[in-house]
Every structure is written in C-alpha cells, then in structure tokens.
C-alpha cells in the first residue's frame, strides 16, 4: 500500500505534463497501471478472477 502522502501528491495537477503519472486507484501502486481501468495489473487480475469487471473473461484459444 502506498503512503497517503504519495496518493495525495499523485492526485495534484502537475505543473508540467511530463511530471504527471498514474497510480492505481485501489492500492496506490505507481507501476503497471492500466489507463483504461485506472488500476494496476495485480488488482486487475484479482478483480478479473473474481468476476467484478463486467464483460471481461479469461482468454482461451
């Protein structure tokens, strides 16, 4: 879990666009965040396995 201060810092509007970065909305992880869902790959996988993301199912070919 990220510190509360880091979550607040990431939520602020950056002075320069290159300083802005995404954080997971659930756990606060700064890396491997899926922009479409705004959550990290770990939380995405967990929610997908639990069936909490509508329209998403495991690929099989």
UniProtKB/Swiss-Prot annotation:
Q: Which NCBIfam families match?
A: PRK08061.1
- What GO cellular component entries does it have? cytoplasm; small ribosomal subunit
What does the entry list as the binding residues for Zn(2+)? 24, 27, 40, 43
State the oligomer form and interacting partners: Part of the 30S ribosomal subunit. Contacts proteins S3 and S10.
Q: Which SUPFAM superfamilies match?
A: Glucocorticoid receptor-like (DNA-binding domain)
Q: What does the UniProt cofactor note say?
A: Binds 1 zinc ion per subunit.
Q: Name one GO biological process term.
A: translation
Keyword terms, alphabetized: Metal-binding, Ribonucleoprotein, Ribosomal protein, RNA-binding, rRNA-binding, Zinc
What's the gene?
rpsZ
The Swiss-Prot or TrEMBL record lists the needed cofactor(s) as: Zn(2+)
Q: What is the lineage of its organism?
A: Bacteria, Bacillati, Mycoplasmatota, Mycoplasmoidales, Metamycoplasmataceae
Entry protein name: Small ribosomal subunit protein uS14
Q: Name one GO molecular function term.
A: rRNA binding
Family the UniProt entry places it in: Belongs to the universal ribosomal protein uS14 family. Zinc-binding uS14 subfamily.
Function comment:
Binds 16S rRNA, required for the assembly of 30S particles and may also be responsible for determining the conformation of the 16S rRNA at the A site.
Task: Give the organism, scientific name.
Answer: Mycoplasmopsis pulmonis (strain UAB CTIP) (Mycoplasma pulmonis)
């Amino acid at each position: 879990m990220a510190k509360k201060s880091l979550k607040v810092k990431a939520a602020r509007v950056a002075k320069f666009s290159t300083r802005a970065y995404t954080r997971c909305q659930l756990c606060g992880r700064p890396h491997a965040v899926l922009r479409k869902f705004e959550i990290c790959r770990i939380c995405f996988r967990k929610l997908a396995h639990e069936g909490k993301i509508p329209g998403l199912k495991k690929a099989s070919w």
